[in-house]
Amino acid sequence: GNMLLSGNVNHGTITSSGQNAAGILCYTANMGDDWQLNIEDCENTADISSEGNVGGIAGFTAYYKTDEAGSSFNIQNCKNSGNLSSTTTNGYIGGILAVDGFMQTQTTIDSCENSGTISFTKSWVMQENELKTENDDGEKEDASLFTLSVMGGGIVGRIGEAVMLSVDADKPDGQEINKKDALVRISNCVNTGALSYEEPQKG
């Protein structure tokens, strides 16, 4: 099957208490083998906020298939200028796409632009013992490094297992960059939006 979203524009503010929100296409999952999904010449100018994942154009995509799917997903010539925010401490924000959860699906994002800000607005509260780490002598001391469970990107917030399944992903090689048979290709995209998050706090 084929699905095309072309020339769509959203100017209305979106506020979601659910898991996902996006300016054009919120959620796509298990679309089936040999499907082609294309989003082109679409634009979001409105602010979008959610308690979960947020994408300026597309929100959450998933097709958990580990063998050849014959499917494709393309976003081309799309723009987001709306400010994107999430109150989660376990989610993703992308100026164009929040989450690419397709596994064996050829995914292309080309000639897209994000100028909206990306912000995680909920502070990450930790207990006193979680804010400490153990040094080489086994003594507890204040931690100097934290790993937040949130990810934000000017173009894409998160790319899942497709990276592992792509062209020689386990063997870094400059010659493998831009291979046409790579599962995920992002090209000619620009981000000028700022990224911010709340610092961890003691609970």
Task: Please provide the spans of the model-predicted regions.
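Surface-exposed loop/turn motifs in large extracellular/passenger domains
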Residues: G1-G203
